[in-house]
Design a protein with these regions (language model features):
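Core catalytic lobe of class I
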Residues: 1-149
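Short, conserved SAM-binding/catalytic segment
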Residues: 151-161
Length: 161
C-alpha cells in the first residue's frame, strides 16, 4: 500500500515496560529481569575481549568498564525475532502476534507466577501464553468484541487443559 510513498517496514516493535533498567550487572540495583531464551552452553569457558568497530579482538579502550570477560554461553538473542504468522482458524485479530512469540517474550522477561499486563489484548494471545507459561495476567482492550474473544479463548483453553 505504501511502497510508492515510503520504505516498506520490515520490523514491528514490541514494547517491554519494567520498573528496572537495562544497565550492566553491578551498575544498577534495580535491573530489568532478563532471561535470554535459546542459549547454548559452550563446552569450555572462553576468554572474550571487548570488540571494536573493526570487528577484531583489540580492546576498545583502557577504561575499567572494558574488561575481558569469560564467555560461558553463545546464541544470545538479537533484536530480530522471526515467527510465522497464524493464517488459519486460530486467527482472531488482524494484528495478532504468533502465540510462540508471546510465549518467548513472557519467558524472556518474567518468571513463573509473575504478572504480565497487556493493555491492547486484541485476540487474547498474551493471556493464553500466560496460562501456558504459568504467569498471572491483566488484559484490557477498548473494543468489547476483543474482550469477548479473549474471554471465550481463555474459557476454551481452560476446558482443554
Amino acid at each position: 500500500v505504501h511502497a510508492k510513498n515510503r520504505p516498506m517496514k520490515k520490523h514491528e516493535e514490541i514494547c517491554v515496560f519494567s520498573e528496572g533498567n537495562t544497565l550492566h550487572e553491578g551498575q544498577s540495583i534495580n535491573r530489568m529481569p532478563y532471561y535470554p531464551q535459546g542459549l547454548i552452553e559452550l563446552p569450555k569457558n572462553t576468554l572474550r575481549r571487548t570488540r571494536n568497530d573493526a570487528g577484531d579482538n583489540t580492546v576498545m579502550s583502557k577504561r575499567k568498564s572494558h574488561k575481558e570477560t569469560i564467555c560461558t554461553h553463545t546464541n544470545y538473542p538479537t533484536s530480530i525475532l522471526k515467527y510465522d504468522i497464524e493464517m488459519n482458524e486460530d486467527r482472531f485479530h488482524e494484528c495478532q502476534k504468533p502465540l510462540l512469540l508471546c510465549e518467548y517474550m513472557i519467558n524472556t522477561y518474567t518468571e513463573e507466577g509473575e504478572l504480565v499486563l497487556d493493555n491492547c489484548v486484541g485476540s487474547g494471545q498474551s493471556a493464553i501464553a500466560c496460562l501456558k507459561t504459568n504467569r498471572k495476567y491483566i488484559v484490557m482492550d477498548n473494543k468489547e468484541k476483543h474482550i469477548l474473544t479473549t474471554k471465550n479463548r481463555i474459557e476454551q483453553f481452560k476446558e482443554i487443559n
